């Protein structure tokens, strides 16, 4: 897409820095490679070799580590893969099964960036048989930027001509995305993990129009709700 106007960029940075939240899905981390503040806000993205640090998850020591100094970001073939929670006490991951199967999707590898104030929330093994790296790659992660929160997930691929929606209709992806949005907006998560959530070895699909595990909404008028949210966060961008 087109580069954002400078005014738009500055507004976005101020919004997050002053306490706002932002959620990025899949290829959104490919964007704005030459925008320094954006790279800091997303922590890791699809970048060329030698750009920032390449961060992976070290399973034996249960921690992130820097590796692959000259590798370029990429992905192998689309396939189902098992996601492992790495920050079980984080609001987004609380009560999420330790491991769960995600529907057929692109598994990004060799994500690179400044990686400042970054917490890896989940990872997945990138199989060499599928064109991957043979290492655990970050899947969902958080970056603290100023007073704000940025959540990035590399799940959620869909392309023109694709005949399946597995990556988007996976209940695991839908749950993590919904919880990420709530967390980015409020700093908290009240949306429960649904009973349809995938198991360790089995994928679970629900089309968006059939989702039943939505958050109950307030009966307050829109104006009242908006005013309350604005008081809680004066930097919030609200729509009716």
Q: Which positions does each model-derived feature cover?
A:
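Secondary-structure transition/capping residues
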Residues: 23, 49, 103, 191-192
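Oxidoreductase and adenylate-handling cofactor-binding alpha/beta cores
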Residues: 38-42, 98-104, 111-118, 156, ...
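Structural detector of well-ordered beta-strand residues that form the stable sheet scaffold
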Residues: 19-23, 121, 151
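Catalytic beta-strand/loop cores that center a nucleophilic Ser/Cys/Thr
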Residues: 44, 58-149, 208-226
């Amino acid at each position: 897409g087109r580069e954002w106007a400078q005014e738009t960029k500055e507004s976005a940075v101020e919004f997050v820095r002053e306490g706002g939240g932002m959620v990025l899905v899949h290829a959104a981390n490919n964007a704005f490679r030459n925008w320094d503040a954006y790279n800091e806000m997303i922590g890791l993205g699809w970048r060329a070799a030698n750009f920032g640090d390449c961060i992976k998850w070290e399973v034996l020591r249960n921690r992130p580590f820097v590796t692959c100094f000259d590798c370029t970001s990429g992905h192998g073939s689309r396939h189902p893969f098992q996601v492992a929670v790495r920050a079980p006490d984080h609001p987004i991951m609380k009560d999420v099964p330790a491991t769960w199967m995600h529907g057929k999707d692109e598994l990004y590898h060799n994500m690179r960036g400044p990686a400042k104030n970054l917490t890896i929330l989940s990872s997945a093994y990138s199989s060499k048989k599928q064109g991957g790296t043979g290492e655990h790659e970050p899947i969902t992660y958080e970056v603290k930027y100023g007073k704000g929160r940025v959540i990035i997930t590399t799940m959620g691929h869909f392309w023109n001509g694709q005949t399946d929606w597995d990556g988007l209709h996976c209940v695991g992806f839908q749950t993590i995305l919904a919880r990420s949005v709530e967390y980015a907006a409020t700093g908290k998560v009240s949306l429960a993990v649904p009973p349809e959530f995938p198991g360790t070895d089995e994928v679970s699909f629900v089309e968006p129009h059939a989702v039943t595990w939505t958050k109950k909404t307030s009966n307050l008028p829109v104006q009242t709700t908006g005013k309350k949210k604005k008081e809680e966060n004066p930097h919030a961008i609200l729509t009716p």
